[in-house]
Amino acid sequence: MLSNPEIINALSQLGLTNYESKVYLSLVSEGICTAKDISNICGIPYGKVYEVINSLAAKGFINVLPTKPMKYKAIHPKELIK
């Protein structure tokens, strides 16, 4: 997982929390993941992951894929800049 402090800082300037930044970066680097995958990759408690995912989706940073189990995909960083 990417954990570059400069990237985390840049994402915080865009309004993301530390957990949101970690989840977004993990999805950018890993691709499509389940909540369990995200929890394992980021070290964020599984119960907290859903709160973070919902927040990122509301802010337009990720897409929620209607699969079983639900999967999540980051919006490409270039798309966010537009």
Which stretches of residues belong to each language-model region?
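Short acidic alpha-helix initiation/capping motifs at coil-to-helix transition points
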Residues: 1-3
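Amphipathic alpha-helical scaffolds
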Residues: 43, 49-52
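Short alpha-helical "packing" element that flanks the helix-turn-helix/winged-helix DNA-binding module
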Residues: 20-27
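A short acidic, leucine-rich amphipathic alpha-helix
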Residues: 37-42
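Key DNA-contact positions within bacterial/archaeal DNA-binding proteins
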Residues: 21, 36, 47
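Short capping segments at the starts of secondary-structure elements
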Residues: 28-34
